[in-house]
């Protein structure tokens, strides 16, 4: 026998490892994953006329060692070659497990920091896909191993994302669809 009992037991332990750690981090929303976002959630610029609403977000099953959370909202299909960041929030305290959503993103918990988006300023802006195209928009919750992310609010979304990935223990994603918007007749 080429492999010994110890080797096989080790493989069995690896297979059961996820069970020993409990359930994975889960992100849920008031909107349904992989479904089209209602138009009233759209931004109110660039040809869109929505109310700029964010959905409620809830997360659970953070891994041991989680010291804070971050939430991002990203258009992975934006015609930029690198997507488009619609919201970046970090330093969400570890005892917070939801954001209520609402107009302009809704309120944030005390201590949370809203970083620059790809508009070059902090805040939230809802989806606004180009006319005639459907885009995939991704909400992500990151469980972080630091209470305070070592970034400044004026960092670009991409640079903040770089630091997020360095400190992410686990993440959960929720993809929503927006569009296609009808072409204007003007």
Task: Briefly describe each language-model feature range.
Residues 21-186:
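N-terminus-centered regions that define maturation/targeting leaders and the start
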Residues 1-8:
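Bacterial N-terminal signal peptides that target proteins for export
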